[in-house]
Amino acid sequence: MDLKESPSEGSLQPSSIQIFANTSTLHGIRHIFVYGPLTIRRVLWAVAFVGSLGLLLVESSERVSYYFSYQHVTKVDEVVAQSLVFPAVTLCNLNGFRFSRLTTNDLYHAGELLALLDVNLQIPDPHLADPTVLEALRQKANFKHYKPKQFSMLEFLHRVGHDLKDMMLYCKFKGQECGHQDFTTVFTKYGKCYMFNSGEDGKPLLTTVKGGTGNGLEIMLDIQQDEYLPIWGETEETTFEAGVKVQIHSQSEPPFIQELGFGVAPGFQTFVATQEQRLTYLPPPWGECRSSEMGLDFFPVYSITACRIDCETRYIVENCNCRMVHMPGDAPFCTPEQHKECAEPALGLLAEKDSNYCLCRTPCNLTRYNKELSMVKIPSKTSAKYLEKKFNKSEKYISENILVLDIFFEALNYETIEQKKAYEVAALLGDIGGQMGLFIGASILTILELFDYIYELIKEKLLDLLGKEEEEGSHDENMSTCDTMPNHSETISHTVNVPLQTALGTLEEIAC
C-alpha cells in the first residue's frame, strides 16, 4: 500500500516519499508516487523518468569528459598602436676572425682550431691559398725560436673580430644619424657581434610612431671580404658564405643568431618589413607553456633561446669544465684545445643524440617579429662612379663587400595570438544545468530540495530510534511499578466500557 496507517489515530497518511514527490519541483515523480495502487500509468511515468535520468547522465558525463580533455582555441586579433618599441637587431659578420689581426701567438694556440694549421702547426694545403695570403700566413706561422705567450679566447675574439666602427659606412634611425656607439657588443657562435637598441647600460628603448621605409633602422656595411680567413679545411665554425647574419628579436631575449638569423648578401640593399606578434600560450593542462617569470640559472627572463643557451652552457661545463665565450656564467673559458677536443664535439653530440637533455617549453608570453624580405641590386650603373669616389673603392669591391640593410615596421600595429580555454567551468555548469532542465526539469534549487529531503528523512529515522529507546526504558519502569500495586481484578465485578477512540495512553493507565 502507498498509504500508511497512522499509529496515533488509526487513519491513513501518505508516506514521506509521496509527500516529497507531490511538493518537489522535480518533473514527473509526482505521477510515479501517487496515492493508490500500482497502475500502468505509474509504470509508464517511471520508465519515462528513468530514461530521462539516464540520458541526463550520459550527456553530462560527455560534457565532463570534454572538460577534462582540456581543449583550447586560438584567438587572432590585430591591434592599432600609437607607437611601438623598435626591436633589438643583432648582426654578425659571417667571418668571425680578421686575417690581418692574427698574430704568431694566435696561430700557435688557435691555428688548428681555425683550420689554418694542422696538428703539427704546418700549413696543410698551401696550393689552395692565394699567394699573397699564403706568404703572410707563412710569416705569421714561423715558430722557429718562438716562445709562446699566454692566450685568452675572450681577448682573442674581441681583438680579432670585425670592428663595427670599420664596417659601418653610415647609419640612420628614423632619418636621424646614428653610429657604432649606438650598438652593444655581444658574443655569439659567430664570434663578436653587435646589437642595436639593446636597452642595456641604462639606455632607453627606441620607439617609432610610423611604419614604412625611412622610419626604422638603415645601415650600410662593408663586410671586408679581404679579411676573411682562407679556407682549405672544414671545422664546426667554417662558413663558405660572405655577408652578415641578422636576427630581429625582443630585448628580453638573448640572440640565437646561428639558428634564428637570416642572411644579408653584399651587393644588395635588403628591405626587411616586420610586424610585431604578441603570443599568449596556456599552461598545463591546457597547453605546454612555461611562465616567463620563471627565470633560469643565467637569465632572469625565460625564453626558448635563453633556455637553449642555458642548457648548452650547463652541458659544456659538466662535460668539459669550461665554457665558450658566448656562454654566460663564471666558469673559465675553454682553451683552443678544449674547444676542438671537447666543447665542439659535445655540442654536436647534444644536438644529434642527446636532444632530450635540452627540452625547452614555449614561454606563456612571447614577442616575436614576422619578416618579409626583398632586395635590390647595388650599385646601379649610374651610381657606381659616385660610390667609387665617395668610399674610395672600386665598383668590383663595392659589389662584393657593400650592403645596405633597411629594417622597418610594415604598419603601426601588432598582432595578438592568444590561446584560450575552449571549455571553462561556467560553460560546463551551464551545459549540465541545461541538460537537467531539458530531461528532468531540475535546477540547483531542485538539488537542494533533494538534500533537504534526505536530511529530514535521516533526522526522522534518528528521532524514531531515540524515541523507541526512551519508550522501552519507560515501559520497563512502568512494569516494575505495576508489580508493586495490589491486584484488584478479583474485586471488580463489572466491565469497563472503553471507547474505541480512546487514546493509547489512557488504555495503558487502565491496564496498569
Curated annotation (Swiss-Prot):
Topological region Cytoplasmic: 1-37, 449-512
CC per GO annotation: dendritic spine; membrane; neuron projection; neuronal cell body; plasma membrane; postsynaptic density membrane; synapse
Lineage: Eukaryota, Metazoa, Chordata, Craniata, Vertebrata
The protein, known as: Acid-sensing ion channel 2
Keywords in alphabetical order: Cell membrane, Disulfide bond, Glycoprotein, Ion channel, Ion transport, Membrane, Phosphoprotein, Sodium, Sodium channel, Sodium transport, Transmembrane, Transmembrane helix, Transport
Free-text function comment from the UniProt entry: Forms pH-gated trimeric sodium channels that act as postsynaptic excitatory sensors in the nervous system. Upon extracellular acidification, these channels generate rapid, transient inward currents that fully desensitize. Highly selective for sodium, they are permeable to other cations. By forming heterotrimeric channels with ASIC1, could contribute to synaptic plasticity, learning, and memory. Additionally, as acid sensors at nerve terminals, plays a role in mechanosensation and phototransduction.
Induction conditions: Expression in a subset of neurons may be regulated by neurotrophins.
Reaction(s) the record says it catalyses: Na(+)(in) = Na(+)(out); K(+)(in) = K(+)(out); Li(+)(in) = Li(+)(out)
Residue intervals passing through the bilayer: 38-58, 428-448
Regulation: Inhibited by the diuretic drug amiloride.
Family statement drawn from the similarity comment of this UniProt entry: Belongs to the amiloride-sensitive sodium channel (TC 1.A.6) family. ASIC2 subfamily.
